[in-house]
Amino acid sequence: MAQVGSAGPGACGRRGAGAGAGPERTTWRWAPALLWLATAAAVAGDPSRRQWPVPYKRFSFRPEPDPYCQAKYTFCPTGSPIPVMKDDDVIEVFRLQAPVWEFKYGDLLGHLKIMHDAIGFRSTLTEKNYTMEWYELFQLGNCTFPHLRPEMNAPFWCNQGAACFFEGIDDSHWKENGTLVLVATISGGMFNRMAKWVKQDNETGIYYETWTVQASPERGAERWFESYDCSKFVLRTYEKLAELGADFKKIETNYTRIFLYSGEPTYLGNETSVFGPTGNKTLALAIKKFYYPFKPHLSTKEFLLSLLQIFDAVVIHREFYLFYNFEYWFLPMKYPFIKITYEEIPLPNRKNRTLSGL
């Protein structure tokens, strides 16, 4: 299935999978910029809304993407429907992890521990393998920064993420520079119940969120916003399998996160309240000015100048405008501003102690 339900690369960027149709409006160069900003940073509202972290908003259905949004790499080109397994089948569950953009940069980002996560399955009855992953429809840049279209007053976002399921596991891709390891064994019936959950999760969780935002790097620091990316999909799926009765092996599992550090965020409003006819024109201009350096299709000279502008805004003036749940927030940035981590998050414990899920 091209997508689990209806409907490229970030910390969850998958390997390239073919050229997308239409103009390449999404050729972004900001993966190196994020790394540069993280290095440079290391060197150098309404009270009723303030539930921290802000809950990720879910939707009743997945909207069709706007035709303006075109992917450089086709989303889920070999996708297929999730098969119905026989209840007495034994399904092996594999942890899959490989460097982001391995198809383009090899193990370069692997050395920096910037990894993409997925899940593999193997049916012992049919001996067929399957891969399931969740990633951006229009690549990382569009999920993280908007387009500033001259015919529109508000920033325009091409931000959707979705699940992709297809037959086969590319052993060399996952093993050569990453991880392919058995983490659990489940029944076919348990797999089928998981599949129903995946479809519902995919239809209601429609957009990608790059950043995890919290008050400081300290353990237990206040967290303002959670990311919503490939690793979070894998973690949610593991939790669901544990809920259904899966027993996971005791092995170390680490995941990439991109953190922003800020004081308590200030809620600014949604697109209408900020950019509409009665919106705050000064605030609207400030938000667009902040996003301007992140635009795509820059020459080398423009790209370097944009890096300086980003550094000035985020590190010198300590400002960041975050778009989350289709609403805008102001982040008063704090040292170390931005950081890419590779953290251990343990596999879940079995939650259902009966044999009903087996």
UniProtKB/Swiss-Prot annotation:
Domain of life: Eukaryota
Illness: Defects in CLN5 are the cause of neuronal ceroid lipofuscinosis (NCL). NCL is characterized by brain atrophy and the accumulation of lysosome derived fluorescent storage bodies in neurons and most other cells. NCL is found in Australian Devon cattle.
Ranges in the topological domain labelled Lumenal: 47-358
Function: Exhibits palmitoyl protein thioesterase (S-depalmitoylation) activity in vitro and most likely plays a role in protein S-depalmitoylation.
Gene: CLN5
GO terms, biological process: brain development; glycosylation; lysosomal lumen acidification; lysosome organization; neurogenesis; positive regulation of GTP binding; retrograde transport, endosome to Golgi; signal peptide processing
Cystines in this chain: 69-158, 76-164
Catalytic activity reported: S-hexadecanoyl-L-cysteinyl-[protein] + H2O = L-cysteinyl-[protein] + hexadecanoate + H(+)
Hydrolase in keyword set: yes
Ranges that cross the membrane: 30-46
Entry GO terms, CC: cytosol; endoplasmic reticulum; Golgi apparatus; lysosomal membrane; lysosome; membrane; perinuclear region of cytoplasm; vacuolar lumen
Name assigned to this protein: Bis(monoacylglycero)phosphate synthase CLN5
Active-site residues, as the UniProt record annotates them: 116, 230
UniProt cross-references to InterPro entries, sorted A to Z: CLN5 (IPR026138)
